[in-house]
Amino acid sequence: MKKILAILILIFTLQTPSQADDIRDFQMEGISIGDSVLNFISEDKIVKKYFPKSKKFYTVELINVELDVYNSIELAVKDNDKTYKIHGVRGYIFFENDTNNCLKKKDEIVEELSEFFKNNARKIDKGAIDYISDIKSDTSKIVTVQFIFNSGDAVHVTCYDMQDPTLGATGVEVSTTTREYWKWNNTEAY
């Protein structure tokens, strides 16, 4: 009888929610919007990478951290925030010169997230668009699907098909952003 009770307790306490009510319910490598960067690396290991036109936010790349799904993780933090609250999580899965598998992985992730967010976020398929670069001969494309919450927070799934290696690697990016960070990134950062 004790074993059955213990099993039932484990079953009901270890279940994860099948749907997310809020972007903070969604984790990437155990990291959520609203967490502190200090939960994942020590303060002395934080290297701030600022954006070209505004220093309101910066990103921190998690280096020498064991990751299960992503090849790389970046966290966005508001400048001068002593609690290091995360406003954005960006994970990358690289597919070296393999656009087909990049698109396939993007579709798999979008399918999973569509179920996870089905009652709480609008799905917007942006389709394929040209990647804007200074290289006139560049034919790189990006394919993006967004999930927008009523709060304005968002999750983006993007396959970058980079034809010019100087622009970056072909791969899937999954990013979660608060409304404030997303708006800033689109209007002030670059």
Could you tell me what each predicted segment is?
Residues 21-64, 87-190:
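Non-cytosolic coordination micro-motifs
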Residues 4-18:
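Sec-dependent N-terminal signal peptides
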Residues 61-85:
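Compositionally biased P/S/T/G-rich terminal and signal peptide-adjacent segments
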